[in-house]
Amino acid sequence: GSGTFERYIRHAGEKDPAQTLTTTFRMSNVDGARYRQAGGKKMLEQKMAEAVDAGTHALPRKKGSVPGMVQKNCIATVAVRVANVDATDFEQLTAAEIEGRRQAFAYEHFLRDCVPGCEDAKIIGLSTQIGVRETRRVHGEYRLTREDCMSVARFKDCVLLCGAPIEDHRAGKNGEDETAWACVPGGQAYDVPYRTLVPKGRDELWVAG
């Protein structure tokens, strides 16, 4: 019954804060050559840290990435960070949507003011919805572990391969970045078994996330 199934559902944030949410955005009119000549990502992080410490721009973090796009003079960004949100609560999620967009335009002003090559940059698009990293955690017939990923585990009931790094996005104090990365050794990919998609206590459902 449903009661049995619910025993195997946990919610992110019950014990430790849930991972942070992110609104991505795209910008045009970026002089990539000038940005790289000024120091690129290392320079960007230095400028972000200076802005946070000086209080000149309301940025939520001291690190971020601005990879280039196929379109000329355009960049995509991963810099917004909205913390302490239960994304299963519609009021909190709505507030996070608003905050994510506010932060995006704060970054636009920062990039124009402080980053060489971005003086004329402008936002040309925002993600249609804020990116939610975790909410409910459904326990499957098998639970993939960190050790499985790092040891490049193999399973007879493998249904897909994954080579992406393990990411854990947390909010630090005063803009410090507490994101933890763990890359799969040797650029390999580990198996994800079918049993991870089958919730404990049910036989008519698949879940993924």
Can you describe what each PLM-predicted range is?
Residues 2-208:
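Flavin (FAD/FMN)-binding glycine-rich loop and adjacent Rossmann-like elements that form
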